[in-house]
Each structure stands twice: as structure tokens, then as C-alpha cells.
Amino acid sequence: MNNIKVFVLMAGLTGLVVAIGQALGGGQGAILALLLSAGMNLFMYWGSSSMVLRSYGAQVVTAQDAPELYEMVDRLRQRAGLPMPTVAIAPQDQPNAFATGRNPENSVVCVTQGIMRALSKDELEGVIAHELAHIKNRDMLLQTIAATMAGAVSNLAQFAFFFGGRSDDDDGVHPVAGIAMLIIGPIVAMVIQFAISRQREFKADAVGAEISGRPLSLANALLKLESGARRIPMQVSPSAATLAIVNPLAAFSMRGISKWMSTHPPTAERVAALQALAA
């Protein structure tokens, strides 16, 4: 099912890019945009995880670099029946974590330095199990491509605003329609991305609790992580932020923002679901 969603996302990205190209350059713009989208789709499949790691400033570590973390990931991935993922650490004070990669054989589990200081061993195990659940559920490619897609469409729209569109004399999309498309395109991409992220987090919480055997430890971790994210800002692209276990941009979020524009489901709802599992 996730493979179908990945195909739909890539097709949607292609359609958005071609539509923007048509708005900016007519038929020639559409052709160039089609070629560009083909390159973007190939990059998203093969290289999006590297881009996400760079966005967080993360570095891959070995068992010699971080023995306790490496052993924890190894033990939990065996319990989940997964191959050993690459382990990475992001030099961020905010406590957070995420998983990325195109499949279980090419996956990465990344934690921040802040999370290793903020959580107990049981709580950190709960978080690692949550990220391994994303890998087990094959969420990473879908979420990583959604993140990259939203960022790519937003960047293309910014480029279009800087360099301008077509004149009234040219054939094709009217300038007003083109401007509307440039505004709506990134919003649509972000809403799709947010919806995917929220949907997959609940399932990863449940599967992660099953892997670790400690749903309450994950619930406690989520409360600590949300508190930390609100107190400690993190500089990361909004598109990559959806991959994290809690919203790393919570410190910048506007109060009263509607649920459908939130990158993550409400932590209180996630905690309640985990408490129900433990009951």
C-alpha cells in the first residue's frame, strides 16, 4: 500500500511541477518542468535520506563511537525482525529523533545529542522502538519523499516569484492563474505531507510499544520531548521536520494553529492511546 502512495506522491509532484512550468513558460516551460520533475523523482528515491541527514546536521556513528546507543538499536531491531539500520547522531540540543531511508535494508535511525541527555534508558528505548516501527511499517520512503516533495515545490515556487512569470501576450496560463498556482501548489504539498505524517505517527507509536514492551515509557518520553521542543529551538527545514517523533519547530509554532496544519498529531492524543494500550 505504501508503494502505491509513493507512486501517487511522485505523480503529484510531477503534475505540480509541470503546471508551474506551464504557468511560467508555456509549452516549453512544461517540457523543461517535466524533465526537471523526472530528475527530482530519481533524486528523491535515491538521495532524499542524505538530504534529510544534512538538514539536521547529523553524522553517521559506529559501535565504537556510541556503543550504548548502537547496542540499544541492535537489540531492538532484532526484536523487531529488521536488518541493522545505520545509526546517526545530530548535534542538536533539542531532544528528538527520526528515521529515514528508502527500505529496511537502507534505513537510518537518528537521535539528537539532546535526547540522550533528556531521557532515561527505558524512555530512549521507547523512542528507538518507535523509529524502528516506522522502518518495519515501511513509512520512511513515503514520509521522506513527502518531505522532499513539499520542500521542492516550495523552492520552485520561490524561484518562480523571484524570476517572474509569463506576460499577457504569451499563450498559456494567465498570469493571475499562474500566481495562484504558485501560491496553492506549496500549500497543497505541505497539507499532503502533514496528513501523511500524522497518520503514520499513531501506528508507529502502537508498533513501537509492541517492540519495546513498554508503552508507558514511550508515553513519558513523548511528554518530555514535546516540552523540550517548545523550550529549545532547532534550526531545520519545515519539510524535514515532519520526520521527527515530535515537531522540532514547536518553539516557532503559532498558538491556536489548526490540527490540519500541524506536522504531528497532538501529543496528548498519542499519550492517551499509549496509556490505553498499557491498561
Swiss-Prot record:
Q: What does the sequence similarity comment in the record state about its family?
A: Belongs to the peptidase M48B family.
Cofactor section:
Zn(2+)
Q: What organism does the record attribute this protein to? A: Gemmatimonas aurantiaca (strain DSM 14586 / JCM 11422 / NBRC 100505 / T-27)
Instruction: Recite the UniProt cofactor note for this protein.
Output: Binds 1 zinc ion per subunit.
- Where does it reside? Cell inner membrane
| HAMAP family linked | Pept_M48_protease_HtpX (MF_00188)
Query: Which InterPro entries does the record cross-reference, listed alphabetically?
Result: HtpX_protease (IPR050083), Pept_M48_protease_HtpX (IPR022919), Peptidase_M48 (IPR001915)
Q: Does the keyword Zinc apply?
A: yes
Q: Which domain of life is it from?
A: Bacteria
Any idea what this protein is called? Protease HtpX homolog
Point out the gene that encodes the protein. htpX
Residues where Zn(2+) binds: 130, 134, 201
